[in-house]
């Protein structure tokens, strides 16, 4: 699903109703399904369990990138249309130094 597909679904179903069960988290730099330079590894099941338990989609999902099996970067995955924005201090390889915000 891409952002334009999501917008079409939200418009057809009604934004408030659809947002209870649909969310899009983009993974910048990830290949088609995995790999690439992006932070492509995250616990999808835990994110869904959190959503069900809390009754709302996660505000962010922390994903990791590994090189030779070692985590070398973490980054928040943000619910569309938000994106991860660098706070301006700290390592750009650590998710804690980013915030999800509208572009």
Label each PLM-derived region with a short phrase.
Residues 1-3:
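Short, small-residue-biased leader/transition segments that mark boundaries at the very start
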Residues 5-12, 51:
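Generic, well-ordered alpha-helical scaffold segments in large soluble proteins
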Residues 14-103:
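Alpha/beta-hydrolase-fold serine-hydrolase catalytic core, especially in secreted/extracellular enzymes
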């Amino acid at each position: 699903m891409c952002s334009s597909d999501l917008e079409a679904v939200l418009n057809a179903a009604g934004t408030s109703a659809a947002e209870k069960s649909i969310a899009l988290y983009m993974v910048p730099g990830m290949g088609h399904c995995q790999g690439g330079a992006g932070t492509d590894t995250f616990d999808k099941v835990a994110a869904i369990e959190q959503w069900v338990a809390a009754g709302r989609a996660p505000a962010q999902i922390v994903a990791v990138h590994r090189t030779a099996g070692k985590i070398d970067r973490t980054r928040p995955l943000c619910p569309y249309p938000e994106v991860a924005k660098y706070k301006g201090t700290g390592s750009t390889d650590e998710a804690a130094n980013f915030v999800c915000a509208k572009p």
